[in-house]
Structure formats: structure tokens, C-alpha cells
Amino acid sequence: MIAKECKPITREASIKPSIENVIPYNEYKKTQPRILGVPQVIQGTNDDDMIVLYGGGRDFILSLLDNEINSNKENGINSINVELFILNKCILMWFKDLGRGIEISYNSVIYHGSNRIQGEDSRDGHRYELVVTVERDLILNELFPVYGEEHSDALSKFSLRSVEFKLRPRYSTYDRYYNVEIETLFTFHNFGVNRGDEMVKNCNDAIALCLEMNENQFISSEEEDLDVETSAYDNEQNTMNQDSNSAVYTGINEVYNTYQNSGYGDDLDGNNMIMDNKFMKNGVEAGMSMEFYNNEAITGQKRPMS
């Protein structure tokens, strides 16, 4: 059985993450019991009711990377103020001006990293920006359309369509500013100095961690399906073998499903004369057939002759 490919789909988000509906990872470690033998960092991905926040930030400026398709233009959009939430289930970008957001599946993330800012905007504590490239779908095409000349249909059919997000912190690590509202989610206790280059590093590490967790789950589900299919195939083969050939061919008889044990099966008694000189009787060598049940190990001990 071949599993059908499940293509990730970006979804619209109408509820903004807050301290009431998500829990920071540091708080999660304190409040949730630890399961023996299971890394605590992975437990949050298995609970459908638990949404864990691993990273993010409030003041990001979103734009798109230049590429050949848009002819060195930013796809016709201006910079947008967004808030980034890196959750155990998805990456959520919240558009402040729209009061809406989008949930990006980790399976659609192609690559991520930090890009060094060039030019006069680069200064101490404000030298890097976060880059996240994701596979396009219907919602992303509608929100971030591609302008300019399109490739041929034959090439587009087999090409991976992607959109490259640039998330630049508004403030430097060393800037002093005051929030309009009291911060209850991205606190210093949970995320440290979450500004400027430190915020980029924290977000990049959080995405890498969540990608690894979701990849492990995807691999585990594939292995479970493969094990089930393999077990079913082995059982079927064993059943067929048992029905068609209930006895193992030992090489001393040309007829299946029968046993003919003749001669002397005493080659473990330590008598070198029998080992060196094959004792033949009626043209048949010594033989012995054994059958093991339930895969139980059979152990024995060689006893010297008295």
C-alpha cells in the first residue's frame, strides 16, 4: 500500500496567540509532568490540546526577498508590521493592521536561516534578519502574488514554487523602547533579551527545533505504517508456506512434507572417529530435523563422554 502524499496547506488564523491560549516552553516544563524515557521537548507536539510557544517576537518588519521572477522588486508589496509566533504545531504570522494571521505548516518550510543586513541599516545589535522560505499554495499566492513574466507551463509544472519571507527586527538589541501594552508572553524570564539580533537567533533556533520534532513524528508515522505492512506481508507468506509445505526439506529426502531420518545423529558426542569417518548405512548419512515454536530460543550443552 502506497500512502498518499499530503501536501501542506496554509490556513488563515483569526485568534491571536496570547497567554490565555498558549504556554511558553519554559512554563510548560515547570507545569507538565515528565515522562520517563521521553524527552520533554517532544511531549508538547503529541498533545492536541496543548499549544507550546518556542519562540517569536512582536516587532518584525515583513518583506519578500528579491528573485528572478519579480525582476528585483518585492512582489509589489510594502513592508508589513507582523508578530511572529513559533508554535509546536505551526509558524503563525500575525498582521497587526489586518487583525488576522496565517498558519504555516512545518512540512511546507523549505529552509530558514539568518541573513546579514547590508548597507546603512546595519548597526551593532541590528545586523541580521530572519529568512524563511516556504512552499506556495493557494492562500500564499493570493496574499503574495507573483508579478512579472511567468515561466512556461511545462517548467512551472515541475518546479517548486516558493515564497521567501524576510523578517527584520524593528529595534536593535540595545534600543530602549516601551511597549504600548504590558508584555505577558515574550517576557525576559521565558525568552531573555528578545530584541534585535538576539531575537533573530532565538527564532532561528526555535524553528530548527520545531522542524526536528515534526520531522521525527513524520518519520515515526511512516515507520509504523511500514512495520504494519511488513508484518502483514510476513504473516501472509508464513501462512502460505505452512499450507503448502509444513515440513522443512532437509536434503536427505526428495519428497516434501515428509521426514526420513536414518543413520547416526551422534556427531556431538565427542567421538572423533565418527566425525572423521562418515558412517554410512544404506547409502544415507545421519540426519536430524527440528522445529521451533513461538521463536523460543533452544539452548543446549555438550557433555563429555564419561
Swiss-Prot record:
It is found in: Cytoplasm; Nucleus. It comes from the Eukaryota. Keywords: Cytoplasm, Nucleus. The lineage of its organism: Eukaryota, Fungi, Dikarya, Ascomycota, Saccharomycotina. GO terms for cellular component: cytoplasm; nucleus. The gene is LOT5. It comes from Vanderwaltozyma polyspora (strain ATCC 22028 / DSM 70294 / BCRC 21397 / CBS 2163 / NBRC 10782 / NRRL Y-8283 / UCD 57-17) (Kluyveromyces polysporus). This is Protein LOT5. InterPro entries: ICln/Lot5/Saf5 (IPR039924). Transmembrane segments: none annotated. Belongs to the LOT5 family.
